Amino acid sequence: MRGNGVGAKFGKVAVLLGGTSAEREVSLMSGGAVLAALQAAGVDAHGFDPAQQDLHILKEQGFDRAFIALHGRGGEDGTVQGLLELLKIPYTGSGVMASALAMDKWRTKMVWAACGLPTPRYAILAGDTDWEAVVAELGLPIFVKPVHEGSSMGATKVTAASQLKAAWERAARFDDLVLAEEFIVGAELTVPFLAERALPVIRIEAPGGKYDYQNKYFTDETRYLCPSGLPAEQEQALQALVMKSARALGCRGWGRADLMLTGDGRPYLLEMNTSPGMTGHSLVPMAAKAVGLDFTALCLAILEDARLG
């Protein structure tokens, strides 16, 4: 069913969704929304869950492109990207190296710091860590999170040294590597990008200032402000910073950087997401809409940029 127009342009498309990571539930929502939009636009798109089918059969079944709507390990960390490279099936988003690097919050911060880009101070935690020394180095509060998880999985805000070990234990259930990060007080922002263009800044106001997994995906109480209300010059500076941060990691196609902005106007890069959510609560579609791209147009733009290498 190649058809004409859009269908012929993209060929047979696999929307990769679900997977086996801790973010499976969100990925199913993201992939379902993308799949519906592509099909409505006339694309010969099919849902494909790597947790239920072997990805090698994508080639056997004649797929021409893959839209990666997987989140977390196994989908956002370079592994799926590497397999698609071997199968020679062009895919959306960043390549193998950038996907793996951005998924690793520790090494992402090392690259940004080496490039002179602002990111909060940090330390790696282990069972034998001197908790008091970490507090002396980073101050309080401290944000503790797994190095390789997204959607705030296993993350804890620590307000006393006595809480650090429990926070480490919680994060360590998700990952062998656990990051302690200086807690930055200020406005929580996110800046998506599409191709070489930064989209509008979004300001996030979560209930109680807690933008966790629940408040990201399953509540209507979190407020997302787009336009952000920032002065135009400041917004442009933040967009430029995000594009620098993406280029430093080798990101391409689309993505989203999370950052904090202090009261005196200093930005701090937190994380880079190379396969952001595409749910009803997601932020890339919101920013795209602000510049005239509806959800379907956004999905088509991302798919059009699918490539190898």
From Swiss-Prot:
Would the keyword DNA-binding turn up in this protein's UniProt record?
Answer: no
The domain of life is Bacteria
User: What cofactors does the UniProt entry give for this protein?
Assistant: Mg(2+); Mn(2+)
| Residues where Mg(2+) 2 binds | E271, N273
**GO function term, MF aspect, one:** metal ion binding
Query: What processes in GO biological process is this protein linked to?
Result: cell wall organization; peptidoglycan biosynthetic process; regulation of cell shape
Q: Which UniProt keywords apply?
A: ATP-binding, Cell shape, Cell wall biogenesis/degradation, Cytoplasm, Ligase, Magnesium, Manganese, Metal-binding, Nucleotide-binding, Peptidoglycan synthesis
Residues annotated as binding Mg(2+) 1: D258, E271
Q: EC number(s) for this protein?
A: 6.3.2.4
Q: Which residues bind ATP?
A: 135-190
Please provide an example of a Pfam family that matches this protein in its UniProt record.
Dala_Dala_lig_C
Residues in coiled coil: none
Q: How is the cofactor bound?
A: Binds 2 magnesium or manganese ions per subunit.
Which EC class is this protein assigned?
A: ligase
Q: Which InterPro entries match?
A: ATP-grasp, ATP_grasp_subdomain_1, D-Ala_lig_Van_CS, D_ala_D_ala, Dala_Dala_lig_C, Dala_Dala_lig_N, PreATP-grasp_dom_sf
User: Looking at the keywords, is Magnesium present?
Assistant: yes
Q: In which pathway does it act?
A: Cell wall biogenesis; peptidoglycan biosynthesis
Catalysed transformations (reactions): 2 D-alanine + ATP = D-alanyl-D-alanine + ADP + phosphate + H(+)
Q: Name one GO cellular component term.
A: cytosol
**Membrane-spanning segments:** none
Q: Which residues form the ATP-grasp domain?
A: 109-304
Per UniProt, subcellular location reads as: Cytoplasm
Question: Which family, according to UniProt?
Answer: Belongs to the D-alanine--D-alanine ligase family.
What function is annotated for this protein? Cell wall formation.
The identity of this protein, by name, is D-alanine--D-alanine ligase
Native source organism of the sequence: Aromatoleum aromaticum (strain DSM 19018 / LMG 30748 / EbN1) (Azoarcus sp. (strain EbN1))
